[in-house]
């Protein structure tokens, strides 16, 4: 069987998707410039952050709800180093590059950036989004960057948590299935 059509399809698929996603995954410098462009156009920027390790339906629903709150959604993900610091050895399961690419592939997500700090507070202070959101497992007073966003006239919201949809529970289910063998 001739494998050239499959190889050509794979190459075209990869080129198309990397071009589509490369414009969504931004460095901090590019993010600052994009934020100024959005601000000048009068567009509302929504910001959220997290590890997003093992993307699941709870993430997808949460991000769609967050995107509906403004004109553009920025998702800031923890670097691999900061995920290890927060979650412990063996995490993240997916590398920061893989997590960024998967998030960038979602229609609801306009921009993705990676931060290496343990808290996104300095990034939030740089970007000053119009809306800052976290999942319902956070109380408003626990959301990093709340003070900065509110002081600039922005809103801070906690969106409902999707029960049973968590990376930790998925990892637990996988371990249970594999330990039975």
List where the protein language model places each region.
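Nucleotidyltransferase catalytic core that binds NTPs
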Residues: 10, 16-180
């Amino acid at each position: 069987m001739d494998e050239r059509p499959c190889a050509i399809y794979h190459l075209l698929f990869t080129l198309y998707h990397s071009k589509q996603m490369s414009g969504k995954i931004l460095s901090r410098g590019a993010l600052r410039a994009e934020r100024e462009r959005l601000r000048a156009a009068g567009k509302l920027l929504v910001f959220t952050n997290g590890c997003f390790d093992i993307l699941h339906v709870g993430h997808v629903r949460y991000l769609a709800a967050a995107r509906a709150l403004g004109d553009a959604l920025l998702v800031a993900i923890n670097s691999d180093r900061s995920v290890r610091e927060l979650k412990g050895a063996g995490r993240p399961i997916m590398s920061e590059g893989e997590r960024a690419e998967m998030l960038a592939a979602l229609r609801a997500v306009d921009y993705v950036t990676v931060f290496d700090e343990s808290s996104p507070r300095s990034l939030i202070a740089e970007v000053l989004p119009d809306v800052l959101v976290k999942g319902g497992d956070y109380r408003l007073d626990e959301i990093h960057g709340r003070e900065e966003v509110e002081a600039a006239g922005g809103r801070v919201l906690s969106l409902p948590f999707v029960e049973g949809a968590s990376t930790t529970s998925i990892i637990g289910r996988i371990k249970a299935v594999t330990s039975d063998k």
